Amino acid sequence: MLLLLLRTLPLGDRILAVIDDTPTKRYGPQVEGADIHHNPTPGPADQKYLYGHIWVTLSLAVRHPCFGALALPLRAMLYVRRKTMAKIPKWRDWTFATKLVLAARLVEWIAPIVKQAGKTLWIVVDGGYVKAPFLKRTLRVGVTVIGRLRKDAALRDLPRKLRRGERRRGRPPKYGKHKISLAKRAAHREGWEVAQCTVYGQTVPKLYKTFLATYRPAGGVIRVVIVEEDHDWYPFFSTDPNATAVEIIESFADRATIEQDFHDVKEVWGAGQQQVRNIWTNLAVYHLNLWIHTLVELWSWSRPRGEICDRRQSPWDDTDRRPSHADRRKALQRQIMEHELSTLAAVQPLPRKILQLAQRLMDLAC
């Protein structure tokens, strides 16, 4: 799937991928790998927990020339709690791994493919994955990580540079001796800059300050960016010290595209609704949902808006709204049915009334 995207889409020299996890609800004690997990979207009922699977998912974040940022899911790994392992039959040959390890395996899978294509890889993660077990394995394969820092992250300044002719005993230090307080840096009035950033489909000014620091989980120097919003401030970082603040801000904003993926895979394709119990079968059907989602997006990439969706029959809708994934799927369904109808008409001519009736039915169905 990744090779198909690399060959088909007009991607630049830098590939941006997003990693995050999402739950799918399942029911029944015989569903292997399912357990009680934290619910990230409790909703009006305030349902703090749910029973089901947790999927650590890797998506390719791209920017469509007309429709903006979107993500193409590529691969996922199923997270099973350690206490749940006893319920899985031993002959399934399933081993325990944390979310951080699963995310690192996804990076180790995609990194050689991207490198072989002659491109660089940036990985965007949320704060839950900014930990040493993930960062160390990821940096080992030559990948740049963009993420969000904790506001109390244990940052230090850069190690002191030696003066000319000065020598130091032992190995050169990686980390500085002085701690850096993000809260104090954010509260200081000086050092702020303004830049135009394209985030969430809009180009807006962002107030930020940036500096270099050392961070032990990242194994050395990182680029830190503090962004000031209306009522709060947020710290981000890049393991590439040469990355600009605009690149970091825009890359992290594109992380939101995977959330739309999770919504579409569940609501449009019905991920989690397949009635299977075997843990490997669950893994297979989830990937089918991911890949059919990506193939539909790939099919509609170069098609104009009018071919994908027609909002004339919905005057209450916003005509400028970009086509949703459901619109793209309906457009593909419509094309398949029209092709089938034209094939039948070529074999045996059909009455005009039958063709008109079939066209009306397709309009209602799609």
Please give the residue ranges for each predicted region:
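Short amphipathic alpha-helical "interface-anchor" segments enriched in bulky aromatics
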Residues: 19, 23, 185, 245-276
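An anionic, glycine-rich sequence signature occurring as long contiguous blocks
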Residues: 64-88, 92, 146-151, 155-257, ...
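Basic, amphipathic alpha-helical segments enriched in Lys/Arg and hydrophobic/aromatic residues
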Residues: 271-333
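Active-site-proximal, Lys/Arg-enriched surface segment
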Residues: 1-80, 195, 206-207, 211-212
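Long, low-complexity C-terminal extensions of enzymes
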Residues: 315-366
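Short, basic/hydrophobic alpha-helical segments
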Residues: 1-7, 94-121
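Short, surface-exposed basic-aromatic patches at helix termini and helix-loop junctions that form
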Residues: 14, 115, 134-144
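Electropositive nucleic-acid engagement tracts
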Residues: 1-36, 109, 140, 165-190, ...
